[in-house]
From Swiss-Prot:
Cell membrane found in the keyword field: no
Cytoplasmic side: 719-882
Record region (V1): 113-170
Keyword terms, alphabetized: Apoptosis, Cleavage on pair of basic residues, Coiled coil, Disulfide bond, Fusion of virus membrane with host membrane, Glycoprotein, Host cell membrane, Host endosome, Host membrane, Host-virus interaction, Lipoprotein, Membrane, Palmitate, Signal, Transmembrane, Transmembrane helix, Viral attachment to host cell, Viral envelope protein, Viral penetration into host cytoplasm, Virion, Virus entry into host cell
Annotated region described as V4, given as residue ranges: 405-435
Name of the coding gene: env
Coiled coil: 637-669
Example GO biological process: symbiont entry into host cell
Protein name as catalogued: Envelope glycoprotein gp160
Job of this protein: The surface protein gp120 (SU) attaches the virus to the host lymphoid cell by binding to the primary receptor CD4. This interaction induces a structural rearrangement creating a high affinity binding site for a chemokine coreceptor like CCR5. This peculiar 2 stage receptor-interaction strategy allows gp120 to maintain the highly conserved coreceptor-binding site in a cryptic conformation, protected from neutralizing antibodies. These changes are transmitted to the transmembrane protein gp41 and are thought to activate its fusogenic potential by unmasking its fusion peptide. Surface protein gp120 (SU) may target the virus to gut-associated lymphoid tissue (GALT) by binding host ITGA4/ITGB7 (alpha-4/beta-7 integrins), a complex that mediates T-cell migration to the GALT. Interaction between gp120 and ITGA4/ITGB7 would allow the virus to enter GALT early in the infection, infecting and killing most of GALT's resting CD4+ T-cells. This T-cell depletion is believed to be the major insult to the host immune system leading to AIDS.
Marked site: Cleavage: 528-529
Taxonomy of the source species: Viruses, Riboviria, Pararnavirae, Artverviricota, Revtraviricetes
Extracellular side: 23-697
Length: 882
């Protein structure tokens, strides 16, 4: 029985210790290096100082560094808010640069165009004769291969084989102008591709023609004579956010576990050039060919090897003039009178294109997504068929003019195709292609929207570096594979920015610790200033273990706050400098929105900390128990980012518990503050407290009355139970009748135990008093038992620990003796070493002194011998003469 009692006592003590020290409580950390995906708007920065580019982006200062992180993150170029924003924003730049505001629907009327010109350029049926003649003539020609370079004469004079005149048609039309009640005749010049003419409905020398897009959409013209021109810009994250980049060379547009991650506040520079088929002047070209392949279809972006130096040089020859014609109020149409027939625009390709395309095919064969033929001879580069002109032609911009280039000659040259199945005009292998210009173009971003672009004056030339191509790769079962060039302009920006992802910094972390709120004393304030590494330095510990990162959480939180404030201030400064230019523009509103978002994020974090009672505290202990005892962090091997992913499902529950605990604590503090009012003696006589005093008095009176009633009922029950044994007790060993003599004169009367109360002279004390005595004795016995067991437990523990302490003490004494002996040996050895050194020094000194003395004597003897030589010679001569 005693052993069982000891075990029970030990179990109770262990449970008490566990309850005190092993319960985990929620601890709030502010400044942890963790993040989550975000979709907040980015802002752009650029160095371009032209008017429209400056109004769209903030000035760029090149102060953007990258920091490597020891983390693993997933990246996707297609499901990516950075690329989606770039696609949308480049379109906004394009739309803002041309500023469409005037509807050209009044020009959707019948125009009388020069019939000879419409016949020549194939807009009427009469062109059949011309076309057939041309076909007959060309059919007799043989396959030609024309390769030109910078020094070729035709390049200088813009008269290379196959290039023609620019197809332009002059037209007349009548419409009401500034005077609405009178019609006026206007003369305009159109590109043939912008017109459609009625067939067989010509009168005399005129053909009936209309604008090409009148029946499909609303066409708008520029208000100002501005031109779309590409700029270089970069995207930057708002304060409180960051951009992660996958730095792995094997990244191909999708990687769930990229281990080479860097963080930055801004992206690399990006070119806003818009074109189909090719990407010009990109920033992702390397000394290798690599492919971004969409995860669910065959859309690809192929980055070309910059080693091959692939270029494209386009030119629109001629000295074109532009004449603004006011057609009606608020409608200025930019006409181009034909002073002399302009030559056709054209583009020339330079570099080792054949080897570059060959390497592209080899890279496709090696790609894990590709399952077609491995024979590169069966992989062909093809042009898309059908669709808008922007699809079938290579569409690009050259200093404001949009060129539509027919690429058959180029594909024949690169692929070295057989030309027997092609049309006569296409039966050539050339490294240049003819292009035509349109003023009414289909926008690449929104289907069915057309924009009129006024022609540009003068001779236009533009040189570009080809860095990638957009294509759809399709193959059959081991037979043929086609690399079909694509018009998905949006894919260009997936290659440029697809290795970035936008994340929101989540500096608030929740983790279990053994510390409960208000159980530890406050730490002393560190007076030394913290070296602020900048906002990116805050994420430097993202790959560190939670324990190491939490040790520097104070400095990290200060760095985080300083970085946010610094970025906000810089952003505000540049916005202020651009205040006038940013007015009423989409990008200006977007830039201001990023600043507001950053402030909202910081205030949101502080409001959340305040709701938990942790405002402006880096490490905040709480009284909320950790809800999942089996889920604890590995402080030495687990990062905060990994831990945040594991406890994401608990965040809502923990947040609610923290708020409830803070509300309860505030209530307790309120009650405590109410009690503090009694500290001042004068408050006791406050008039507002008199009503409370009256209430307390009434409560006391009612309590006294109730107590009297209870005492009366107890006394009544006691009288009724007098003389009876308690029904809930065993035979009362504690009950002993105490005989008393009521009257000494009366004889003693023996009464039986258990008899009812009588009027005899003998009676027993009430059993309740004896029962109380019994309880007291049992309590004393229990306390004695507890004391004896505790003493026994302590004595046994002492007996167990005493030998251990004795052995430990003996071991320490032996270690001390050994150390003292070793120290003595070392001291003796050191003294012996010192004596040896001194003896060696003395011996060396004596030896050197003796050697120096002998050397000095030898030198003296030699010197005397040398000095004596003349004297000996003289003495010898004297002896000889004698």
């Amino acid at each position: 029985m005693g052993c069982l009692g000891n075990q029970l006592l030990i179990a109770i003590l262990l449970l008490s210790v566990y309850g005190i020290y092993c319960i985990q409580y929620v601890t709030v950390f502010y400044g942890v290096p963790a993040w989550r995906n975000a979709t907040i708007p980015l802002f752009c920065a650029t160095k371009n100082r032209d008017t429209w580019g400056t109004t769209q982006c903030l000035p760029d200062n090149d102060d953007y560094s990258e920091l490597a992180l020891n983390v693993t993150e997933s990246f996707d170029a297609w499901e990516n808010t950075v690329t989606e924003q770039a696609i949308e924003d480049v379109w906004q730049l394009f739309e803002t640069s041309i500023k469409p505001c005037v509807k050209l629907s009044p020009l959707c009327i019948t125009m009388r165009c020069n019939k000879s010109e419409t016949d020549k350029w194939g807009l009427t049926k009469s062109s059949t004769t011309t076309a057939s003649t041309t076909t007959t003539t060309t059919a007799k020609s043989v396959e030609t291969r024309d390769i030109v370079n910078e020094t070729s004469p035709c390049v200088v004079h813009d008269n290379c084989t196959g290039l023609e005149q620019e197809p332009m048609i002059s037209c007349k039309f009548n419409m009401t102008g500034l005077k609405r009640d009178k019609k006026k005749e206007y003369n305009e010049t159109w590109y043939s591709a912008d017109l459609v003419c009625e067939q067989g409905n010509s009168t005399g020398n005129e053909s009936r023609c209309y604008m090409n897009h009148c029946n499909t959409s609303v066409i708008q013209e520029c208000c100002d004579k501005d031109y779309w021109d590409a700029i270089r810009c970069r995207y930057c994250a708002p304060p409180g956010y960051a951009l992660l980049r996958c730095n792995d060379t094997n990244y191909s547009g999708f990687m769930p576990n990229c281990s080479k991650v860097v963080v930055s506040s801004c992206t690399r520079m990006m070119e806003t050039q818009t074109s189909t088929w090719f990407r010009f002047n990109g920033t992702r070209a390397e000394n290798r060919t690599y492919i971004y392949w969409h995860g669910r279809d065959n859309r690809t972006i192929i980055s070309l090897n910059k080693h091959y130096n692939l270029t494209m040089k386009c030119r629109r020859p001629g000295n074109k003039t532009v004449l603004p014609v006011t057609i009606m109020s608020a409608l200025v149409f930019h006409s181009q009178p034909v002073n002399e027939r302009p030559k056709q625009a054209w583009c020339r390709f330079g570099g080792n294109w054949k080897e570059a395309i060959k390497e592209v095919k080899q890279t496709i064969v090696k790609h894990p997504r590709y399952t077609g033929t491995n024979n590169t001879d069966k992989i062909n580069l093809t042009a898309p068929r059908g669709g808008d002109p922007e699809v079938t032609f290579m569409w690009t911009n050259c200093r404001g003019e949009f060129l539509y280039c027919k690429m058959n000659w180029f594909l024949n040259w690169v692929e070295d195709r057989s030309l027997t199945t092609q049309k006569p005009k296409e039966r050539h292998k050339r490294n240049y292609v003819p292009c035509h210009i349109r003023q009414i173009i289909n926008t690449w971003h929104k289907v069915g929207k057309n924009v009129y672009l006024p022609p540009r004056e003068g001779d236009l030339t533009c040189n570009s570096t080809v860095t990638s191509l957009i294509a759809n790769i399709n193959w059959t079962d081991g037979n043929q594979t086609s690399i079909t060039m694509s018009a998905e302009v949006a894919e260009l920006y997936r290659l440029e920015l697809g290795d970035y992802k936008l994340v929101e910094i989540t500096p608030i972390g929740l983790a279990p610790t053994n510390v409960k709120r208000y159980t530890t004393g406050g730490t002393s304030r560190n007076k030394r200033g913290v070296f602020v590494l900048g906002f990116l330095g805050f994420l430097a510990t993202a790959g560190s273990a939670m324990g190491a990162a939490s040790l520097t959480v104070t400095a990290q939180s200060r760095t985080l706050l300083a970085g946010i404030v610094q970025q906000q201030q810089q952003l505000l400064d540049v916005v202020k400098r651009q205040q006038e230019l940013l007015r009423l523009t989409v990008w200006g509103t977007k830039n201001l929105q990023t600043r507001v978002s950053a402030i909202e994020k910081y205030l949101k974090d502080q409001a959340q900390l305040n709701a938990w009672g942790c405002a402006f505290r880096q490490v905040c202990h709480t009284t909320v128990p950790w809800p999942n005892a089996s889920l604890t962090p590995d402080w030495n091997n687990e990062t905060w980012q990994e831990w945040e992913r594991k406890v994401d499902f608990l965040e809502a529950n923990i947040t609610a518990l923290l708020e409830e605990a803070q509300i309860q604590q505030e209530k307790n503090m309120y009650e405590l503050q109410k009690l503090n009012s009694w500290d001042v003696f004068g408050n006791w006589f406050d008039l507002t407290s008199w009503i409370k005093y009256i209430q307390y008095g009434i409560y006391i009176i009612v309590g006294v009355i109730l107590l009297r009633i209870v005492i009366y009922i107890v006394q009544m029950l006691a009288r009724l139970r007098q003389g009876y044994r308690p029904v809930f007790s065993s035979p009362p060993s504690y009950f002993q009748x105490t005989h008393t003599q009521q009257d000494p004169a009366l004889p003693t009367k023996e009464g039986k135990k258990g008899d009812g109360g009588g009027s005899g002279g003998n009676s027993s004390w009430p059993w309740q008093i004896e029962y109380i005595h019994f309880l007291i004795r049992q309590l004393i016995r229990l306390l004695t038992w507890l004391f004896s067991n505790c003493r026994t437990l302590l004595s046994r523990a002492y007996q167990i620990l005493q030998p251990i302490f004795q052995r430990l003490s003996a071991t320490l004494r032996r270690i001390r003796e050994v150390l003292r002996l070793e120290l003595t040996y070392l001291q003796y050895g050191w003294s012996y070493f010192q004596e040896a050194v001194q003896a060696a020094q003395r011996s060396a000194t004596e030896t050197l002194a003796g050697a120096w003395g002998e050397l000095w004597e030898a030198l003296q003897r030699g010197g005397r011998w040398i000095l004596a030589i003349p004297r000996r010679i003289r003495q010898g001569l004297e002896l000889t003469l004698l």
